[in-house]
Amino acid sequence: MAIDENKQKALAAALGQIEKQFGKGSIMRLGEDRSMDVETISTGSLSLDIALGAGGLPMGRIVEIYGPESSGKTTLTLQVIAAAQREGKTCAFIDAEHALDPIYAKKLGVDIDNLLCSQPDTGEQALEICDALTRSGAVDVIIVDSVAALTPKAEIEGEIGDSHMGLAARMMSQAMRKLAGNLKNANTLLIFINQIRMKIGVMFGNPETTTGGNALKFYASVRLDIRRIGAIKEGDEVVGSETRVKVVKNKIAAPFKQAEFQIMYGEGINSRGELVDLGVKHKMIEKAGAWYSYNGEKIGQGKANACNFLKENPAIAAELDKKLRDLLLHSGGELVAASGDDFEDDEAETSEQF
């Protein structure tokens, strides 16, 4: 009908105007797949890369990762650095919390000899360093840990108890305006780690909020909510955390997806466990009783042994990873989150959980 055609033309013109004014990806159809033309860096978790829809975090954009204490925020960003360094990219870590552990970073695969690190005195100094690194065009990934620790100079120089209403929010707002364009031009990924605070007097709805005002929420292309949802035990000893990440905002693909994976203490994200779980889900790995097989060859009895096989055979792990990415990303396949419920018989057969 003519009316429908006119509406379509008007809609197309409106969408074009919005994208021209606010940038590509500011509006899209929920089921639309426009993510493959965006350069990304892996998060170190296959299921999270798939949930993001583009295979990782987008270059040239601002990303916010927030969650409660000890939920895996810094671990996730260190895994991003390790993945970027494997691709030959230059990374920087702005340690505003003064809490970065180089030994732990090295265990996660970070090349600490080639990682730029700064421990700024004030929030303004941290953000100026970010801007200088971005404008150089030579740094590919910058991590700021964390927004809550970016203390304005006036607050540091003042007395404890002085009121500095909205100072940090104004500082972040100004920095976002300055950084957003430079990041796009330099194709630099900037990740802000943030903490959670509680709003006072909220009776209905979610009382949680993040620090630093609203500017970061608006300028971030991706916002990830990371939570610890359980413990992983070997006997009575806790050896890791079950982790869930929700993609609460996504400008490069459809938002609101989530991923579950395991973070092993001292090792990081259990990527091989994800390969086994997703491989079984999508029938790339056969499971008969306790035995796992790949391409007709047995790779281990129990999930722990199957993971060890993939660790000892990185070529097979890479092949399986590529097949899963091709299926779940490039063909628009749907991620089925691997959960412990599907592998209850594994828990009965072995005390080792991954």
Curated annotation (Swiss-Prot):
Lineage: Bacteria, Pseudomonadati, Pseudomonadota, Gammaproteobacteria, Enterobacterales
Keywords per UniProt: ATP-binding, Cytoplasm, DNA damage, DNA recombination, DNA repair, DNA-binding, Nucleotide-binding, SOS response
Family: Belongs to the RecA family.
Chief location category: cytoplasm
Name of the protein: Protein RecA
Subcellular location: Cytoplasm
Pfam families: RecA, RecA_C
Keyword check for ATP-binding: yes
Gene: recA
GO annotation, cellular component aspect: cytosol
